[in-house]
């Protein structure tokens, strides 16, 4: 099968602080952020609910880095697909150190999910939608339609099929994350790196 192995990391968590975006000499963007994932369990002896939070360093490159810097804020819930990499660096005292990071490059994914956006639970989650991408905007219904009815209404208003070619415009998917088969729906704000 995979004689060389597989290096794939999938994380769903909350951003710990606003992403830091900088630019390399060649003009390519790099975004750094920390992502918190938590697990909870009940202690068998005490019956207490316990929680453990793990912090992950995430580095995004290129267009994904630019979009992350623009739309992702502290508290945002995001889905990340990338690869685990360890790099060596030297601190100011001349001591060699190692850092392990999740790197999201070409072929990686960053998807904005529902939940907290910049610490404001009432803020609308349109940050990763098609705004600013040159695609026509559909009016957002303000009635009590179900998401399926809203999707059907939107798809009837689209006259042109979307292709999968080498386009700079995003493809408007409304897919759930495959492992979320327990009724969880994560929205449609997906950004893929395509070169």
Swiss-Prot record:
Residues 6-111 form the SSB domain. One of its GO terms (molecular function) is single-stranded DNA binding. Residues 55-61 bind DNA. This is Single-stranded DNA-binding protein. The lineage of its organism: Bacteria, Pseudomonadati, Pseudomonadota, Gammaproteobacteria, Enterobacterales. NCBIfam families: PRK09010.1, ssb. Gene3D superfamilies: Nucleic acid-binding proteins (2.40.50.140). Keywords: DNA-binding, Plasmid. Residues 111-176 are annotated as: Disordered. PANTHER family: SINGLE-STRANDED DNA-BINDING PROTEIN. It comes from the Bacteria. GO terms for cellular component: nucleoid. The keyword Secreted does not apply. Homotetramer. Pfam families: SSB. One of its GO terms (biological process) is DNA replication. Residues 119-163 have a biased composition (Low complexity).
